[in-house]
Amino acid sequence: MTTLSPEAFAGHTPMMQQYLRIKADHPDTLVFYRMGDFYELFFEDAEKAARLLDLTLTQRGASAGTPIKMAGVPHHAVEQYLAKLVKMGESVAICEQIGDPATSKGPVERKVVRVVTPGTLTDAALLSDKNDVYLLAMCTGHNKRGVAVNIGLAWLNLASGALRLAEIEPDQLAAALERIRPAEILTPDGATDAIPAGAGASKRVPAWHFDIASGTQRLCDQLDVASLDGFGAHSLTSACGAAGALLLYAAATQGQQLRHVRSLKVENETEYIGLDPATRRNLELTETLRGTESPTLYSLLDTCCTTMGSRLLRHWLHHPPRASVAAQSRQQAIGALLDAPANASLDALRSALRQIADVERITGRLALLSARPRDLSSLRDTFAALPALRERIGAIVANADALARVDAALAPPAECLDLLTSAIAPEPAAMVRDGGVIARGYDAELDELRDISENCGQFLIDLEARERARTGIANLRVEYNKVHGFYIEVTRGQTDKVPDDYRRRQTLKNAERYITPELKTFEDKALSAQERALARERALYDSVLQALLPFIPECQRVASALAELDLLAAFAERARALDWVAPTFTDEIGIEIEQGRHPVVEAQVEQFIANDCRFGTERKLLLITGPNMGGKSTFMRQTALIALMAYVGSYVPAKSACFGPIDRIFTRIGAADDLAGGRSTFMVEMTEAAAILNDATPQSLVLMDEIGRGTSTFDGLALAWAIARHLLAHNACYTLFATHYFELTQLPAEFPQAANVHLSAVEHGHGIVFLHAVNEGPANQSYGLQVAQLAGVPAPVIRAARKHLAYLEQQSASQHTPQLDLFSAPPAAVDDLECADAPALPDTPHPALEKLRDIDPDDLKPREALDLLYELRTLVRSHDADGHA
């Protein structure tokens, strides 16, 4: 706790002194200070909140001679304001009144009960149902010379309790953060590690929090183990330092221990198929290139019935396992679900899953003692539904090991269910303060207090009847209001009949209101009973939460099984609805896809042309040529997506598919300027290409699209040619290489492992029809002018382009315009790659033939046809005069 000098409080009121002490402990955090029905912010916090939340900034009095600037939000709407602030990367300390105003002699006692930060969200109102929120800490490991040798990462999903560790090379940080996507990143004070822009809100914490020995011990204490050997984390010293800082920070924000963080997963990069940031972006796994959530592979696959399944799907897509065993187990389960008997049909199973609550997040809130009444009723109803759910899958578990494992994990925790059933009302109120949360019959004292409150009406009816009979006042009434409580009302004309034990409580224009000793006694009992019932209910609810804590591991087990079952059922539904098949796997090098389809594009169009893709030891690179908009990029992406889906465990959009080992997927598709990093489009392209050339292995799948753009034609051609040869000669990876440099189609003559394929188009009238079919051999042209015409480029521009194209093609073979080279001339005989003959340029097409290709005879008038004939003769004579055959 921060200690302030007495001078800091001089002249401040006691309440402001209390606030300043609290604020001193949270200097970089907005403090929501509870005052009655509002959370107030003061001074700089008020100014900042008013700006961020569009609140009214007020000024009320002064403290120590300084005007008190204030802004506030109503307590019942605080969650919507918290959601806005954490989305902006802000943290908020919630300061509640914990003392009783009636007994406080000075300011009501207050303390910070929790700190809401971007990475520590657990409230349902602050969380996205289908996205996990991660808090990540990073700790750099150095050698004896002070050189960074690794970066230890620890990240926690506080809502579920999932904790993971990893150690990576320093240059892998951007890829790791892109995969994890933390909402908040903790780094040591003074650290120089550069966090990529947009990676998450950054928070500096004291460097001693990252002490490796302390972190290791804190991690052991958290997991209740003597050693981390059983988790495979004993050698991850940097990651243990990061974990120590992470656990310390997370516990401090919650103001309590993290009871649900009881296990640890160590992630190794060799465990999953590598996907760098460019690949995740270009394949549009969970986000489109435009930044929208659909249409993506995730949006297509996500037909999950629970939010737990949806979140697990996102995790699986970003973590495809390299070992095919996991994928085969999942696909076996999908097959069993598709072949299930009528009493365990897929539709019936999914219908049952729709009734399941978010057990994972409810368990997290339960562990933090922040679960609300309807969380507990939802947990109860879910556990009650588990036996029927297990009956549905019981008939098919013998056909799938994954389903058998899920079935065993779905055994409901009986004691937990009994407690929830007996303690929680069938339909509880949203908040404990509203009452009606604890079930009748659970506590005798509460039942008695409720009876007093609930039987109030009958007592008043009986009292009114007795008093009318006793006094003879026929219109006497017994009533209640919040200001005066219970009273007996008598009209003016009947007051002479009032008995002596009536005491006047209020005089009205036409009536008098009285209280009697009997009514006063009842009033005291009834009003106190309601307050006592609410207090008793609060105490009972807290005791129920405490009693449920031992069941957290069982709740987590059930949540994990439900998420996996839901996702497997969603995969089965997609396979059935979209006509997908189970892929097969082999240990041999190769990829065989028969009639593959792009899963996302197919869902957006009426008809999709399926295509084959084949790789093997004798076929490692496909040179893809064809027209713009012909489908080259779609074909490339669909190959990568089908491979990824297969290893994730889904069925795939193809007639058949077989995959050998795949360790990484690389893409170099499209690019844009990196303005923030000061890199041009070409520089971005070359950086991505360099990563592929340096890291791709014979088991990597590489997508290269239009490499060499953004510089001069010959520089680009030379680079594309050299990169393609390097991928063949050195990387020997599976490569899809799309290009408009037709000169590269000669590469298979030098490298038999390369093959030409093309996508065709045919001209029809003035237009062009794309066939989208992949055929063997190179394309004959790219139809760039026709595509420009389709895009709406004005006709005069198209005609001018055609003429200039003919001129350029005529000149290109006879002369070469000097250009500024990216490279100096290479020295003689460096190696076989640099000394290899460059591809020869093809013969220039005859200009007369080019002219004829652009003619539609049906559109020519007789005079135009004659003029065209003379023009063609002139082109032929001119061409011959220049020495062409």
Curated annotation (Swiss-Prot):
Tree of life domain: Bacteria
Keyword Nucleotide-binding annotated: yes
Gene Ontology terms for molecular function: ATP binding; ATP-dependent DNA damage sensor activity; damaged DNA binding; mismatched DNA binding
Keywords associated with the record: ATP-binding, DNA damage, DNA repair, DNA-binding, Nucleotide-binding
InterPro entries documented for this protein: DNA_mismatch_repair_MutS, DNA_mismatch_repair_MutS-lik_N, DNA_mismatch_repair_MutS/MSH, DNA_mismatch_repair_MutS_C, DNA_mismatch_repair_MutS_clamp, DNA_mismatch_repair_MutS_core, DNA_mismatch_repair_MutS_N, DNA_mismatch_repair_MutS_sf
S-S bonds: none
TM spans (from-to): none
HAMAP family linked: MutS
Protein name, as recorded: DNA mismatch repair protein MutS
